[in-house]
A protein has these predicted regions:
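Phosphate-bearing ligand-interacting subdomains
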Residues: 33-131
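Short, polar loop motifs at secondary-structure junctions
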Residues: 10, 29-35
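Short hydrophobic segments within beta-strands
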Residues: 6-7, 29, 60-62
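Conserved SAM-binding loop
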Residues: 32, 142-149
Length: 149
């Protein structure tokens, strides 16, 4: 059973450590780290180190939406396709995991796909609500062309 590497060592990474369980997390990964850093006793590894060991672990991206998208692009660019956006699983612990152990749940390819799908679905719904708000509160006939200033 693969343990978890949390990509992101900030506030959301610390929250993910608590939610996913310290016993299930091997370490953190951060693009901006020094090799001696630890958080809650967990080492913080560099992205370069992650590239060497990623096949042995589950990567959970524990960052805000903008940074999650940047890290997804970074991982995909380096050929890493198996990752789980934390924003795609947070809040589902009791509803989805149920009696299953978190590692058992997250090690399933089907559940990893569910987390990715859920992340993009929530992102879409958020953008849709912003567009709906804009449509309800603006008059397109009063918009002027951009001047570049």
């Amino acid at each position: 059973m693969k343990k978890i590497i949390l990509f992101g060592s900030g506030h959301m990474g610390r929250d993910a450590l608590h939610v996913l369980g310290e016993e299930n997390v091997y370490c953190y990964c951060d693009n901006y780290t020094n090799s001696s850093k630890k958080i809650k006793g967990k080492p913080v590894i560099s992205y370069r180190k992650l590239l060497q060991i990623y096949n042995e672990y589950l990567i959970v991206i524990s960052l805000n939406e903008v940074n999650t998208d940047n890290v997804i692009a970074q991982l995909e660019n380096d050929g890493i396709r198996e990752y789980i956006p934390y924003l795609g699983i947070v809040g589902f612990k009791t509803k989805v995991w149920g009696e299953k152990d978190v590692l058992t749940y997250l090690n399933s390819t089907e559940n990893q796909c569910f987390a990715q799908t859920n992340y993009y679905k929530n992102k879409y719904l958020h953008e849709k609500s912003k567009l709906q708000y804009l449509m309800e509160h603006s008059d397109i006939t009063k918009l002027l062309p951009a001047t570049g200033e």
